[in-house]
From Swiss-Prot:
It comes from the Eukaryota. PANTHER family: WD-REPEAT PROTEIN INTERACTING WITH PHOSPHOINOSIDES WIPI -RELATED. May contain a beta-propeller domain involved in specific binding to phosphatidylinositol 3,5-bisphosphate (PIP2), leading to the association of the protein to the membrane. GO terms for cellular component: cytoplasmic vesicle membrane; cytosol; phagophore assembly site membrane; vacuolar membrane. It is a peripheral membrane protein. This is SVP1-like protein 2.
């Protein structure tokens, strides 16, 4: 969906798709009709919309168009295998996987200049662009670290540690103020991190881990002992909470949607309604949404608390 407008991007999927999987339809809900149709040789895995552009992710390429009727093709970029259809579209930049696993291509929309960010050594699993377009967060298939980059110069600003064991990252999302990052994974945990920003003072893992707010004091004095493994000094989330994965399992009755590789409905999709409220949505027969809020305790430390939930395809509360 394009912001809060009446335009919806639709791609066929499921057991009985209305549209073929290689066809993108832009639907005008106000006029109740199709206004743009695009067809490709392979399945559409991801779509991003802005007021001026349509971005389509295929398995090995990214296609950009002017948002007009008829649409005008602007560019095609080659990528490594991108089965999740990863792409982030801002007002000034477009980010998507590079030609090598773990790399990010960052395109400046006004000039078309392309920069390469060597973000990870393993394939990308998730990406998120801040609302102001100045910060890019990435995670790989390893699922232990989230790396933060400034889009203005592609510099790495921080590494945030989700955990020490392997995990499948479901979703990354940056808050409306550009100051917080939420992360979900198959560990059924929602993590919330403070996020560095280029407009603020220079940021480093050492500064974050020694901050006075206690956010990163997971290991206490161990984090300050030289030569210990970096896991003791890395930046951890300041708050976390459990979310529900649901009870359904992959099976012959479920047709996984395009852009997923888990053989099960998408889970843990994050949305911020404001800087203190996070929604986590899961689909499938056990589809539900959960609402989490960030609150300060008596000592001023923030906690992530589940305030409510509902099964939107069944009964719940």
């Amino acid at each position: 969906m394009l912001g809060q407008s009446n335009y919806l991007a639709l791609v066929g999927g499921g057991r009985q798709p209305k549209f073929p999987q290689n066809k993108l339809v832009i639907w005008d809900d106000a006029k109740q009709k199709v206004v743009i149709t695009l067809e490709f040789r392979t399945s559409v895995l991801g779509v991003r919309l802005s007021k001026s552009r349509i971005v389509v992710a295929l398995l090995n390429s990214i296609h950009t168009f002017v948002f007009s009727s008829p649409p005008k093709k602007l560019a095609v970029f080659e990528t490594t295998d991108n089965p999740l259809g990863l792409a982030c579209l801002g007002q000034k930049v477009l980010a998507f996987p590079g030609r090598s696993p773990g790399q990010v291509q960052l395109v400046e929309l006004e000039t078309g200049n392309v920069s390469i960010i060597p973000a990870h050594s393993t394939p990308l699993r998730a990406m998120a662009l801040s609302p102001d377009g100045e910060v890019l967060a990435t995670a790989s298939e390893a699922g232990t670290l989230v790396r933060i980059f400034a889009t203005s110069n592609c510099a790495k600003m921080a590494e945030l540690r989700r955990g020490v064991d392997h995990a499948i990252i479901f979703s990354l999302a940056i808050s409306p103020s550009n100051n917080l990052l939420a992360v979900t994974s198959d560990k059924s945990t929602l993590h919330v991190f403070n996020l560095p920003h280029p407009r603020n003072a220079p940021y480093s893992n050492q500064q974050a881990s020694s901050s006075d707010d206690g956010v990163n004091k997971k290991w206490g004095i161990l984090g300050k002992i030289p030569l210990l493994p970096r896991v003791f000094s890395d930046v951890y989330s300041f708050a976390s909470a459990h979310f529900e994965l649901g009870e359904e399992e992959p099976g012959p009755t479920y047709a996984p949607p395009l852009g997923t590789v888990l053989g099960r409905p998408p889970k843990g999709v994050i949305g911020w309604s404001n800087d203190n409220t996070i929604l986590v949505v899961g689909s499938g027969s056990d589809g539900r949404w959960e609402k989490f809020v960030l609150r300060d305790d008596e000592e001023g430390k923030k906690h992530c608390i589940r305030e409510g939930w509902k099964k939107y395809l069944g009964s719940g509360s």
